[in-house]
Amino acid sequence: MTNSTDRPVSVSSWRTYRRLVAFAKPYRLLLVAALIAALIEAAGTTGFLALMKPITDETFIYKNAEVSRWLPVQIILLFVVRGIAGYITDMAMGKSARSIARDLRIKVMAKYLRLPGSRFDSEPVPSMLIRLGSDSDQVAQAAVDAIKVMIQQSLQVIGALALMLWHSWQVTLTILVLAPVLAWVMDKVARRYRRISHSIQESGAHLLQAADQTLSSHQEVKIYGAQQTEMERYGALADRNLRLAMKVESTRGISTATVQMIGAIGLSALLFVAGAQALAGRLTAGDFVVLMTSMLTIIPGLKQLTNVQNMVQRGLASAERLFSVLDSPDEPDQGAVALTRAKGLIEFRDVTARYPGQVNPALADVSFIAQPGTVTAIVGRSGSGKSSLIKLIPRFYDAEAGQILLDGQPVQAYALADLRRQIALVGQQVMLFDGSIAENVAFGEMRSADASQLERAILGANAMEFVAQLPEGLQSHVGAKGGRLSGGQRQRLAIARAMLKDAPILILDEATAALDNESERLVQDALHKLMPDRTTLVIAHRLSTIEHADQVLVMDQGRIVERGTHHELLAQGGLYSHLHGMQFRERQA
């Protein structure tokens, strides 16, 4: 069925930054406000450092009483302004960054719903949840915390350096000799964080997938005594995640120690050159204190800038994972033929279909016609291609060769939304959402249905007998995946949903395979009310349920090997007769 590069880190980062900037455009006023406030905050820090000269010279050396009176007031005012600016920075950055993450999350979710069915075969749902959950949060965290720290600390470092240049350019230039070494260290740290971040996120997705599989199948795990096996598998994945996390910690530790060592060398150079300047009479005690406090402000700022690289690179790696989804091609949808309500004539002409990466086709040269208002049953052993055939009609997948026609037109000629509007589906695994019964029946485009339409559908599906007994009736919540209801009750709600849709084509995918006799009787009765005047395709496990079908297609290894009515196929004594005989003997036993 049709349907980690080694790019240079700097190029990849720049492309990702540019795309994130596009998402930031709606919030540019907030970001400008955050930048202005950050400038004021940095200016406050620089102003405080500048006050070190009059504090030292005027207060302690020249004993100037007037300065001692106005300096405390000035410091208080300075920090009030700085605090207000910091609050504005935090709020503006937080609002814009969280909004960007929300927009990304919504766009990725919408994109997943437009992707072809093959994507859901190749990417497990836990991986999708990682992208929608933690990846989006990582982008927000990088934008809120990391970018905020980078802006604030960068401005403070620049302000402190400017102040140092003003007081002694000779001392400052001596220290700036170390800048290329520091830049090299930070670049190496960023590259390493970037590589590890990708691996950690993939490792986290594998951990979540393993936990989802084990916990979802907890009954089988307990029955077969597989707890130890599953824990060993999960433990191995957790160990790999730990090793990657320790690489991050190792990188952080080494980079922090290196930055501190460079800072210590710079501080030593400052003391040496400043001492020489003071002996020559070119540097006062106040100048020295300003240089010293500025240097002591720069060192932790550089340390924070180095440490925050991990957060930034995690955010960029997460953004790339999200963008890879957004860049995936949508389901092909170029249909232009108008379709309000189909007659329901379905024709397969020499259809061959193959799943991606598979050598053998799922379907091979399949041809048949389903007339409007008739019932076509599709039977065969497990893996014979029954479900694959059904998935081609609503174009969850596209055929590799041949044609599928609806009312004489290839299904590709219709817009996907119009085509799928003609189809109602009742499967073996009914998916109900965590909401009320009414919300689950009047689902999607049917949410505008009135109460009388909803009640008729519920009654027709034989569901009112249990709905009426619930405390809140139609407004009763069904729980996650319909967990508060039995299998038969969920199935009848699915039939009510199909009745309310009133589509001309009905697909029943083993709708009664997992039900007990009483539930099956109620569901079969509801289906008999639903099927008239529709083109119905039934995948049947219990052959006794399709004895009155207008035609039966018997499939084996992706091909139709027999076709005819129930009685005609029994008389032929072929595969259908064999399958029917096996089921009859099982019932007798």
UniProtKB/Swiss-Prot annotation:
ATP binds at residues 380-387. The lineage of its organism: Bacteria, Pseudomonadati, Pseudomonadota, Gammaproteobacteria, Lysobacterales. Residues 32-314 form the ABC transmembrane type-1 domain. In MsbA the ATP-binding domain (NBD) and the transmembrane domain (TMD) are fused. GO terms for molecular function: ABC-type oligopeptide transporter activity; ATP binding; ATP hydrolysis activity; ATPase-coupled lipid transmembrane transporter activity. Keywords: ATP-binding, Cell inner membrane, Cell membrane, Lipid transport, Membrane, Nucleotide-binding, Translocase, Transmembrane, Transmembrane helix, Transport. It catalyses: ATP + H2O + lipid A-core oligosaccharideSide 1 = ADP + phosphate + lipid A-core oligosaccharideSide 2. Belongs to the ABC transporter superfamily. Lipid exporter (TC 3.A.1.106) family. PANTHER family: ATP-BINDING CASSETTE SUB-FAMILY B MEMBER 10, MITOCHONDRIAL (PTHR43394:SF1), ATP-DEPENDENT PERMEASE MDL1, MITOCHONDRIAL (PTHR43394). GO terms for cellular component: plasma membrane. It comes from Xanthomonas oryzae pv. oryzae (strain KACC10331 / KXO85). Homodimer. Its main location: membrane. It is an enzyme of class 7 (translocase). Its EC number is 7.5.2.6. It is found in: Cell inner membrane. CDD domains: ABC_6TM_MsbA_like (cd18552). InterPro entries: AAA+_ATPase, ABC1_TM_dom, ABC1_TM_sf, ABC_transporter-like_ATP-bd, ABC_transporter-like_CS, ABC_transpr_lipidA, P-loop_NTPase, Type_1_exporter. Residues 346-582 form the ABC transporter domain. Involved in lipopolysaccharide (LPS) biosynthesis. Translocates lipid A-core from the inner to the outer leaflet of the inner membrane. Transmembrane domains (TMD) form a pore in the inner membrane and the ATP-binding domain (NBD) is responsible for energy generation. Pfam families: ABC_membrane, ABC_tran. This is ATP-dependent lipid A-core flippase.
